[in-house]
Amino acid sequence: MFDKRVLNQKVWLGFLALHEVFLNAFEYQISARVGSFSRIAFNQSVINSKKGIYPTGSYVTTTGALQVDFSLLPKGIENHKLGFGVGGEIGSLAYDSTKFLIDEADPKAGFQPANWYYMGRWEGYLMQHSQNWTREQKAQNARPYVLYNLYLDYQYKDIFGIKLGRYPSKALFLSGFNQGFELFYRWKKFRIEWFSTFGRALANEQSIRDFYAPVNYKQKTNYGMHNLNLIYENKYIRVVPFIWFYPNNFNAPGFEITHDTKSYWKSDWRIQTTFYAWFPLYSDYLSKDYYRASLIGKKSAILFVFQRVHFRSYRFGWSVYKNFGNGSAQLGWNGSPVDPFYDTKDDTPYEDAYSNFYNANSMTINAFIGKSIKNLLVQLYGKLTYSPRADSQSLGVTFKYNLKKHIYLMLMFNGYQITMHKGYKVGFFTSGYNPDFAQTIQNRSYLMSSMSYRF
């Protein structure tokens, strides 16, 4: 009689031999992280939707992520690269201050939870349930997990490359993770890039969100948002004419001009100055709708200029962002060049978390100064936003500390006040000025912290 133990031994030995061959032929990297994020808000008011009164909302998350990246070509091949990766994250709300809140103006509407917005938001891939689900239903249908990485990446030298699947996005107007593809071709000092997205996801300690269509307006088909860049760059200047578009919704031509002293000025100083302009042009049917209580209209424009200065361990800078018309109605709230400078989504989740930075005809002024001390970064920043709908002011300080090699800590305090002008109301976006809405002033100050262990 055949001994099954011998067979099992041979199978395992064969598997180990193949595993050893694979390790010798290919490279791979395993990375993981566990962490927690918290936002403790100072405003824990009741909800009164009739008056436009809402709390800021406090919450605490716990998250864990695992990722594996492979190089699929033998180690001896130098000019060609072929990569594959898979990664996912799961999380939960350890605390949610909004879980059992009731609307004073409409008690029969049931509980009004809101922090599912950060941990597991899911209203359908096409956002088809955003209007017909209650807040409680949205909390019940939350998906605090996502397979954020599943990609194939080919590159020939620095001349040509293509990447497709799910992977981290570096696109100007898409933060988080992309579900789509991109490619580039370089010739001398020119580089052409194409980017297509059919889904966006978030995966970090603060937010988990499964892939959804980043732009889809009253359509049952996602046509994708697309981008073409033509980049010219030398050691003095970078010039990028570009266009972003979504079929049947909008076309947004624009350009970037950047001057950076890093490549030619050998000094303790580094000065980077960038100017962006883009011009969203909306379709006829979209132009008749409202975004953040303002008519979208046909034409709009956005100007953004910033300057960053580094001197030894110091850094400081400023920026100005100006909306002409309703430029953010389709492009910008899924990511924008502003994102590295300050958080544009730190309002109450009852306002979709978006700050008044996105309002029509708004102007936002920002400044910061910081210093690095070994593994500690301290940064002071301020932000002023003015718009017909609302004004806001914030002043905050952030501490970031890398403890040893794998542990990262962050602590932030932000004093933040929003004045909603007469005629507008928090959380009300579907029509324009209404004289029955009274002015409100609400405190949106918060304390944020995060900790993570990564390897």
Placement of each model-derived feature along the sequence:
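Transmembrane beta-strand segments that form the barrel wall of outer-membrane beta-barrel proteins
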Residues: 159-171, 176, 181, 192-196, ...
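Cleavable N-terminal export/targeting peptides
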Residues: 1-27
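Residues that define the transmembrane beta-barrel architecture of outer-membrane proteins
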Residues: 26, 58-64, 143-148, 175-179, ...
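Outer-membrane beta-barrel translocator/channel fold
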Residues: 94, 193-254, 260-340, 411-454
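Beta-barrel outer-membrane channel/assembly domains of diderm bacteria
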Residues: 20-162, 185, 398-403, 409-414, ...
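C-terminal structural cap/anchor segments
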Residues: 320-402
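Residues on the lipid-exposed face of transmembrane beta-strands in outer-membrane beta-barrel proteins
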Residues: 64-72, 150-154, 181-185, 228-234, ...
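Short loop/turn motifs that connect adjacent beta-strands in outer-membrane beta-barrel proteins
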Residues: 24-28, 71-84, 158-159, 189-191, ...
